[in-house]
Amino acid sequence: MKGIILAGGSGTRLYPITRGVSKQLLPVYDKPMIYYPLSVLMLAGIRDILVITAPEDNASFKRLLGDGSDFGISISYAVQPSPDGLAQAFIIGEEFIGNDNVCLVLGDNIFYGQSFTQTLKQAAAQTHGATVFAYQVKNPERFGVVEFNENFRAVSIEEKPQRPKSDWAVTGLYFYDNRAVEFAKQLKPSARGELEITDLNRMYLEDGSLSVQILGRGFAWLDTGTHESLHEAASFVQTVQNIQNLHIACLEEIAWRNGWLSDEKLEELARPMAKNQYGQYLLRLLKK
């Protein structure tokens, strides 16, 4: 399975912060925002990843993440010339995806919860159809909303409905079989001129192959699209890390625990950061 992080867009809701830098490069407490969705793919066991950015930000992402070897993975890059919809990621990434299934995660979504790794690997193991991750919200009219039956099969999906049929929002994490590329090519732009991910998901629903994985009690799904939510996400990460003495979205740790980095490589990466808490945390891992 391949992984795609969509890290384009203009981030206008975060102006003036994002006038000179991509939203997905902003810090969320102690690490860049893009570390969080990248960690999701790595926890799912995905090692071949495409990062799609706005043209003006591509070099900055390459400078931060390189070819992925520091994290035991392979990272490629592509650009989205203009924000023409989430589903466009599959058209841009067609050659990268090839004959594989694919997971798409949005570059500004943060997930945290017990047994999340197991949940991700189960979704990644599906060979047919699509899986969306749903989260219960108090204001579903602001989101894509999915309705599902007792077997967790989607029965309806709508984008920002005035009268939601459920209070389960579709998060920015999606697993698809290889048909996603051809389905995306068949989409027509919506009224706002975008290739909508909800329309792509509806094609799987009409095919009877759209599954829903709920993120229930004990899970956190954080959006970082506003000044307030960005601050809240940073506070959440800080609180969890301080209480548990564990790091969220520590890419080096995930790679090391997955057997993708040796002890020697982890120490090599940690030493230049030994004066801050992040580097000290990595060095402590080697002593346990």
Swiss-Prot record:
The keyword Signal does not apply. Keywords: Magnesium, Metal-binding, Nucleotidyltransferase, Transferase. Mg(2+) binds at D108, D223. Gene3D superfamilies: Spore Coat Polysaccharide Biosynthesis Protein SpsA, Chain A. One of its GO terms (biological process) is biosynthetic process. Its EC number is 2.7.7.24. The keyword Transferase applies. Its cofactor is Mg(2+). PANTHER family: GLUCOSE-1-PHOSPHATE THYMIDYLYLTRANSFERASE, GLUCOSE-1-PHOSPHATE THYMIDYLYLTRANSFERASE 2. This is Glucose-1-phosphate thymidylyltransferase. It comes from Neisseria meningitidis serogroup B (strain ATCC BAA-335 / MC58).
